[in-house]
UniProtKB/Swiss-Prot annotation:
InterPro entries: UPF0358, UPF0358_sf. Transmembrane segments: none annotated. It comes from Latilactobacillus sakei subsp. sakei (strain 23K). Belongs to the UPF0358 family. Pfam families: DUF1507 (PF07408). This is UPF0358 protein LCA_1078.
Length: 98
């Protein structure tokens, strides 16, 4: 069975988004968000790179504009949720220490 190039492109981008999320999760676990402003730079860099990758896939018609927007929005949402969860956990830990 032959898989369409569009499907391969979409699956590749989904996989890359999952890798970015996993990378950021590891970095969040290793860094204290409230004491490490560099984490926002890391997030911005990863999202910028992924956005450029998605833009390229759209230009060569591996994915539609709608699919590209959905991929970027999903990754941004997951990263924001992860960041918020870790930040809240760290804030609660700070309260309990004081």
């Amino acid at each position: 069975m032959m898989i369409k190039q569009e499907t391969i492109g979409y699956m590749t981008l989904k996989s890359d988004a999952a890798k970015i999320e996993a990378l950021l999760t590891k970095q969040f676990d290793a860094l204290c968000l409230s004491q490490c402003p560099i984490i926002e730079e890391i997030i911005d860099t990863q999202l910028f790179g992924f956005t450029k990758e998605v833009d390229f896939a759209k230009r060569v018609r591996l994915i539609s504009d709608q699919e590209g927007s959905q991929l970027v929005n999903e990754l941004e949402t997951r990263i924001n949720q992860l960041y918020l969860e870790i930040y809240q956990t760290q804030a609660q830990n700070e309260v309990h220490r004081n």
